[in-house]
């Protein structure tokens, strides 16, 4: 469903013909629905938590149990199942190893990049940045100064921690569109998860509760070392009883 969003709050939007516009925070947005009705929606409401109805809708579309989706979220995002660090900023994990590998593949000198942008390769520093989330974004922003596309592709996004390098498997046209959708809502993060596992043939593993096969496909060859399959099974056992 396409929705047209117009900013109606009184805060300024600085625009320049030769530079990217900087969008300032707004108190509310006017949402125009296809039937031409308009409703006023607060900025906070745009990032409302996932509901049982959201889970049920996607589970029914995929032909799987709600508990299997919650199990994946539990393992990837933690028991809080939070998709956003703050409004407009999804929870992320900037992977330095993936970043360095993709830089080399693009012909970029990693040693020079590390010297000019040390923050992109630094360990998480909560004391310096104030929180885990801010520290992750500091690394992403520093990496983006080297290569915006590679930095986004080297980051795992949202409550299902989908790697940016998988954007093509999420039915989007670019990594920028992928990030834009990830930044919209937890419901959109769930939708991208559904697209991702459908395009990769992983739905059958969730249907069969084949946690080992799903963990291998979703998390890669190191899944066993980190016990992903056991954690998924345990999380499913918990949610299937609710």
Predicted region positions:
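Boundary at the C-terminal end of the N-terminal hydrophobic targeting segment
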Residues: 17-23
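Repetitive helical segments and hydrophobic/amphipathic motifs
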Residues: 12-15
């Amino acid at each position: 469903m396409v929705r047209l969003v117009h900013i109606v709050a009184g805060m300024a939007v600085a625009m320049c013909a030769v530079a990217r516009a900087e969008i300032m925070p707004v108190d509310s947005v006017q949402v125009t629905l296809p039937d031409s009705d308009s409703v006023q929606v607060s900025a906070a409401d745009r990032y409302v938590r996932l509901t049982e109805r959201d889970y049920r809708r996607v589970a029914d579309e995929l032909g799987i149990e709600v508990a299997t989706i919650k199990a994946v979220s539990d393992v990837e995002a933690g028991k809080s199942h939070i998709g956003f660090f703050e409004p407009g900023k999804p929870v992320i994990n900037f992977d330095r190893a993936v970043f360095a590998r993709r830089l080399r593949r693009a012909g970029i000198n990693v040693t020079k990049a590390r010297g000019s942008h040390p923050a992109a390769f630094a360990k998480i520093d909560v004391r310096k940045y104030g929180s885990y989330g801010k520290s992750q974004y500091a690394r992403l922003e520093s990496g983006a100064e080297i290569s915006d596309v590679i930095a986004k592709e080297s980051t795992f996004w949202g409550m299902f921690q989908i790697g940016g390098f998988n954007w093509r498997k999420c039915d989007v046209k670019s990594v920028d569109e992928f990030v834009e959708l990830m930044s919209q809502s937890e419901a959109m993060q769930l939708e991208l998860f559904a697209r991702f596992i459908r395009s990769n043939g992983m739905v059958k593993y969730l249907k069969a509760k084949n946690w080992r096969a799903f963990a291998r496909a979703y998390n890669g060859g190191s899944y066993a070392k980190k016990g992903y399959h056991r954690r998924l099974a345990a999380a499913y056992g918990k949610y299937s009883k609710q």
